[in-house]
Swiss-Prot record:
Coiled-coil intervals, chain numbering: none
Localization terms from the record: Mitochondrion
Family classification: Belongs to the universal ribosomal protein uL16 family.
Organism: Acanthamoeba polyphaga
UniProt keyword terms in alphabetical order: Mitochondrion, Ribonucleoprotein, Ribosomal protein
Any single GO CC term annotated in Swiss-Prot or TrEMBL for this entry: ribosome
Top-level taxon: Eukaryota
Name the record gives this protein: Large ribosomal subunit protein uL16m
Disulfide bonds: none
Name of the gene this protein is made from: RPL16
Length: 39
């Protein structure tokens, strides 16, 4: 699960360089990564 989320975040960051990603999606994943780091 952690690997999938890492790949998903990596894809999200790489795609954000080409396409504008809604801030809602970015904030959503930021919260998830914060929860993962916290736990």
């Amino acid at each position: 699960k952690n690997v999938n989320e890492t790949l998903l975040l990596r894809a999200l960051k790489s795609s954000s360089l080409r396409l504008p990603v809604p801030t809602k999606i970015i904030k959503k994943y930021d919260k998830r990564t914060d929860c993962i780091k916290g736990s």
